[in-house]
From Swiss-Prot:
<dbReference type="InterPro" id="IPR013766">
    <property type="entry name" value="Thioredoxin_domain"/>
</dbReference>
<dbReference type="Pfam" id="PF11412">
    <property type="entry name" value="DsbD_N"/>
</dbReference>
<dbReference type="InterPro" id="IPR017937">
    <property type="entry name" value="Thioredoxin_CS"/>
</dbReference>
<dbReference type="InterPro" id="IPR035671">
    <property type="entry name" value="DsbD_gamma"/>
</dbReference>
<feature type="transmembrane region" description="Helical">
    <location>
        <begin position="302"/>
        <end position="324"/>
    </location>
</feature>
<dbReference type="GO" id="GO:0005886">
    <property type="term" value="C:plasma membrane"/>
</dbReference>
<keyword id="KW-0520">NAD</keyword>
<dbReference type="Pfam" id="PF13899">
    <property type="entry name" value="Thioredoxin_7"/>
</dbReference>
<feature type="transmembrane region" description="Helical">
    <location>
        <begin position="344"/>
        <end position="366"/>
    </location>
</feature>
<dbReference type="Pfam" id="PF02683">
    <property type="entry name" value="DsbD_TM"/>
</dbReference>
<dbReference type="GO" id="GO:0009055">
    <property type="term" value="F:electron transfer activity"/>
</dbReference>
<feature type="disulfide bond" description="Redox-active">
    <location>
        <begin position="516"/>
        <end position="519"/>
    </location>
</feature>
<keyword id="KW-0560">Oxidoreductase</keyword>
<feature type="disulfide bond" description="Redox-active">
    <location>
        <begin position="131"/>
        <end position="137"/>
    </location>
</feature>
<keyword id="KW-0472">Membrane</keyword>
<keyword id="KW-0812">Transmembrane</keyword>
<feature type="signal peptide">
    <location>
        <begin position="1"/>
        <end position="31"/>
    </location>
</feature>
Length: 608
């Protein structure tokens, strides 16, 4: 066998590595306390539809959200009036600031603004406000777009107006395409998904047949390895293209996916597909299609590397009908992320996982593969529950928060029942049934926690016991917080720091706003902690209230390169700003560690 026989294989390998490398390069490093400037976290654009109508779009970065009730429109001059805004439904989120459920938007927001008989050009001013999941709330942002009532064609997209409180800090301009997602973790997850998909009952029996078609009857082990890998890479190219297409489609479908009917239709599709995984019906291509595709693949030379790659691409459609439901769930996830690069990398990893057993068979390691049996049926059922979870995840943005928590509870408990968690194990049960029992108990407890949380007033499935914690904190007799001295301008801060330096005391400057959810959490959960109060006993406590978002407030935020509250700046006893700062919400333990790093144990008195 000559080296030239491996050239097509090498080209396929290079293509696969190039796809993965491009996806990796798309991920910048992001520190835990780096936040996007508001104009990048909430990218504003607008297009004039006709003389009176403007379509407004916000591209919301991953890890950020906007408030529905904070959206408002105005005109300059103010004589122009507008029809009432028709905003799409948002995701319901419990807001600690207002102590009620509020609607929020993620990923994308599209709505139209209609002026009432505007005769002359005017500027449309859109006011919006949003927050980051990590705890920072931005001041209200005003974006401006020029409207020409006589315009007959769409105007170009508007440039965003720099929001109040933005700064030139380099760290805040680090943009994360995945919103902090880990591409390596996503690749490993989809690689494992591909392995699991291969071991479903309708795919595993086909591995020896496919191996015989690809490798041929008289291939050496080296030749078999080359042809098998080529087959897998051919299949991977198809799946990668599907993943990229799903990501690109997701970018264009984000606005449509905010519609409750569209979300409901996708969720219903996931439920229908899950029924196939539970064995209620068989899902596969029509017999005529499968026959024609098989004939086309059989006409190719069985032992050629290039032919194997083409057959791998064809087999992406005919090899595994059982893969279709789980693949649909994966594509639904990719489409919602709206990231084409991640979509391609994820599906490439999944196809590689699906191809590993085929390569093992091709090189003669078929004896390492498990036999088909009952556990493979269980694997299909696991995917069925995953698809039900995908359905719930898709429709969750339009569900009331309490209903979403109840639905997750029902799904988790149903999975526990399927694992026979509440059935007695025989005395001679093996390790796998016992492991299933353990997993079932964990699922049942997780479902019970959701029910307890919703009964206690929790409204977040990821933090189901938040209501219990709020009730517990409210019941504490000693919930006194620290007392701050209010400052309103840069000059007042400088004067207060100089006064503290004269007495040899360090300073802590806290940024606060009434509309800041995480500020309320810091006030209620962190600054009321006895250990925090003790550690701050000898520290001069300043607080800048930037609720009004006036000129002095913006100057203060800019002075310390902040986008918004909550944030805490420290000064040592000599008046020097400490390199350590707190951005976003921190619980008492974490805040104490930050305080001691900033001021040292000598100045930040440790609690006893």
């Amino acid at each position: 066998m000559t080296l030239s026989a491996f050239l097509p294989l090498r080209r396929l390998l290079q293509l696969g590595l190039l796809l993965v490398a491009m996806a990796t390069l798309a991920l910048p490093a992001r520190a835990a306390d780096d936040f996007l400037p508001p104009e990048q976290a909430f990218r504003f654009s607008a297009v004039q539809i006709d003389g009176q109508t403007v379509e407004v779009k916000f591209a919301i970065a991953d890890g950020y959200y906007m408030y529905r009730e904070r959206l408002a429109v105005a005109a300059d001059p103010a004589t122009v009036t507008f029809a009432p805004l028709e905003l799409p439904p948002g995701k319901v989120k419990f807001d600690d600031t207002f102590n009620k459920d509020v609607e929020t938007y993620r990923h994308a927001l599209v709505f139209r603004v209609k002026a009432r008989e505007a005769a002359s050009p005017f500027s449309l001013i859109v006011t919006s406000q949003g927050c980051a999941d990590q705890g920072v709330c931005y001041p209200p942002m005003k974006s401006r777009f020029r409207v020409e009532p006589a315009a007959a064609s769409p105007a170009p997209p508007a440039a965003p107006l720099e929001a109040a409180g933005s700064s030139d800090a380099l760290g805040g301009r680090i943009a994360s395409t995945l919103g902090g997602g880990n591409l390596g973790a996503i690749a490993v997850l989809f690689l494992g998904l591909g392995l699991l998909l291969t071991f479903t009952p309708c795919v595993l029996p086909m591995l020896p047949i496919l191996s015989a078609i690809v490798v041929g009857e008289h291939a050496t082990r080296m030749r078999a390895a080359a042809v098998s890998v080529a087959y897998v890479l051919g299949m991977a190219v198809v799946y990668t293209a599907v993943g990229v297409a799903a990501g690109l489609a997701g970018q264009g479908l984000q606005a449509a996916l905010q519609n409750a009917w569209v979300l409901g239709a996708f969720a219903a599709l996931m439920v229908v597909l899950s029924l196939a995984m539970f064995g209620l019906y068989e899902l596969q291509l029509p017999a005529a299609w499968r026959h024609r595709l098989t004939q086309a693949s059989n006409r190719l030379s069985g032992g050629q590397v290039a032919g194997a790659a083409v057959m791998g691409a064809l087999s992406a459609l005919i090899v595994s009908p059982c893969v279709t439901p789980a693949l649909a769930g994966a594509l639904a996830y990719i489409a919602q992320t709206g990231n084409a690069m991640v979509g391609g990398a994820a599906l490439f990893s999944m196809s590689i996982g699906m191809g590993v057993p085929l390569v093992l068979v091709g090189v003669g390691a078929g004896n390492l593969l498990p036999r088909a049996g009952y556990w493979l049926v269980v694997t299909k059922a696991i995917f069925g529950f995953i698809l039900l979870g995908v359905a719930l995840w898709i429709v969750q943005p339009v569900l009331p928060a309490w209903l979403a928590m109840v639905a997750w509870a029902v799904l988790l408990i149903a999975a526990a029942v399927f694992l026979r968690t509440f059935d007695s194990l025989p005395a001679d049960a093996g390790p796998l049934p016992r492991l299933g029992k353990v997993v079932g108990v964990v699922l049942a407890l997780a479902g019970a926690v959701q029910l307890v949380g919703v009964a206690a007033g929790g409204r977040d499935p990821l933090q189901p016991l938040a209501g219990v914690m709020r009730a517990s904190a409210g019941a504490q007799p000693d919930a006194r917080g620290v007392v701050f001295q209010r400052v309103k301008s840069v000059s007042e801060v400088d004067e207060a720091v100089r006064a503290a330096t004269a007495t040899g005391r360090p300073v802590m400057l806290d940024f606060y706003a009434d509309w800041c959810v995480s500020c309320k959490e810091m006030e209620r959960l962190t600054f009321t902690d006895a250990r925090v109060r003790a550690a701050l006993a000898d520290v001069v406590l300043l607080q800048a209230d930037v609720t009004a978002d006036g000129a002095d407030d913006r100057a203060l935020l800019k002075r310390f390169s902040l986008f918004g509250p909550p944030a805490t700046i420290f000064f040592d006893a000599q008046g020097n700003q400490a390199p350590v700062r707190v951005v976003g919400f921190e619980r008492a333990e974490t805040f104490l560690a930050s305080l001691r790093r900033a001021l040292g144990t000598a100045q930040a008195k440790p609690s006893t």
